[in-house]
Amino acid sequence: MSSRKQASQTRGQQSAEEDNFKKPTRSNMQRSKMRGAASGKKSAGSQPKNLDPALPGRWGGRSAENPPSGSVRKTRKNKQKAPGNGDGGSTSEVPQPPRKKRARADPTVESEEAFKSRMEVKVKIPEELKPWLVEDWDLVTRQKQLFQLPAKKNVDAILEEYANCKKSQGNVDNKEYAVNEVVGGIKEYFNVMLGTQLLYKFERPQYAEILLAHPDAPMSQIYGAPHLLRLFVRIGAMLAYTPLDEKSLALLLGYLHDFLKYLAKNSASLFTASDYKVASADYHRKAL
């Protein structure tokens, strides 16, 4: 009887130790289920009837310094790591799980694969507009000409005309919401990115003059079509940092491509070399 009791106690102790060893895996699975449920709630709200309820604050934010947490990609990464906590068969390895748990304590850190996949967001420029991008570059960097500011038709006016054009094609509330979100987002991106990413070096003294002359005006009220087109060469890299899932991002890209088609269709009136002028000798000295 004594030997049976000891054997029973030994088996109970081994079972308890084994359960303790596997607890990190079970708890991690519980967390993964909770994250999966949260992700499901988010995707459930993403309906194609409008731009997407998952795009608050104009496409869900733009800061590269604040990567989204709790994304689908990161949940998968955690699930892949979880089985490692239960590998091995010796109870002497019990202290190891806490070390592994601390290694992944920051849920906001993206995997290298997830980061690279986000860098692949590309906005396709219509073939009709590519020659103008080249001419714009040549006029400014080689011929040393400047786009005349304020523009005859500024970015705000172009976006407003596009919105009116789309709304006139069908008075659907969801469609109107989508157009307003797209136009508002393009305008915000333009105003944020112009001074740091959309200007050639030769244009910077002109930009400084504009800031002095119009300190309270958004740049979308000053600049025109050429600089707006430059935005779409750069915007893909910025979209890589938005917390949008693949479905929402694909929907957004569809709207951006539709706007680019509008620019291409109206390129004859929006893009012309006569809107540039040769910079003065005094300006050349400033630009050196």
Curated annotation (Swiss-Prot):
Protein's cellular compartments: Nucleus
InterPro entries, alphabetized: MRG, MRG_C_sf, MRG_dom
Claim: Transcription is one of the keywords in the record: yes
GO BP field: chromatin organization; DNA repair; positive regulation of DNA-templated transcription; positive regulation of double-strand break repair via homologous recombination; regulation of apoptotic process; regulation of cell cycle; regulation of double-strand break repair
PROSITE patterns to which the protein is assigned, alphabetical: MRG
Positions bearing Phosphoserine: S71
Region spans: Disordered: 1-115
CC annotations in GO: NuA4 histone acetyltransferase complex; nucleolus; nucleoplasm; nucleosome; plasma membrane
Domain MRG: 117-288
Biased composition regions of type Polar residues, renumbered to the chain: 1-15
Main location, first listed in the record: nucleus
Keywords: Chromatin regulator, DNA damage, DNA repair, Growth regulation, Nucleus, Phosphoprotein, Transcription, Transcription regulation
Cross-referenced PANTHER family: MORTALITY FACTOR 4-LIKE PROTEIN, MORTALITY FACTOR 4-LIKE PROTEIN 2
Subunit record text: Component of the NuA4 histone acetyltransferase complex which contains the catalytic subunit KAT5/TIP60 and the subunits EP400, TRRAP/PAF400, BRD8/SMAP, EPC1, DMAP1/DNMAP1, RUVBL1/TIP49, RUVBL2, ING3, actin, ACTL6A/BAF53A, MORF4L1/MRG15, MORF4L2/MRGX, MRGBP, YEATS4/GAS41 and VPS72/YL1. The NuA4 complex interacts with MYC and the adenovirus E1A protein. MORF4L1 may also participate in the formation of NuA4 related complexes which lack the KAT5/TIP60 catalytic subunit, but which include the SWI/SNF related protein SRCAP.
Function according to Swiss-Prot or TrEMBL: Component of the NuA4 histone acetyltransferase complex which is involved in transcriptional activation of select genes principally by acetylation of nucleosomal histone H4 and H2A. This modification may both alter nucleosome - DNA interactions and promote interaction of the modified histones with other proteins which positively regulate transcription. This complex may be required for the activation of transcriptional programs associated with oncogene and proto-oncogene mediated growth induction, tumor suppressor mediated growth arrest and replicative senescence, apoptosis, and DNA repair.
Name under which the protein is recorded: Mortality factor 4-like protein 2
UniProt organism field: Mus musculus (Mouse)
Lineage: Eukaryota, Metazoa, Chordata, Craniata, Vertebrata
Name of the gene encoding the protein in the UniProt record: Morf4l2
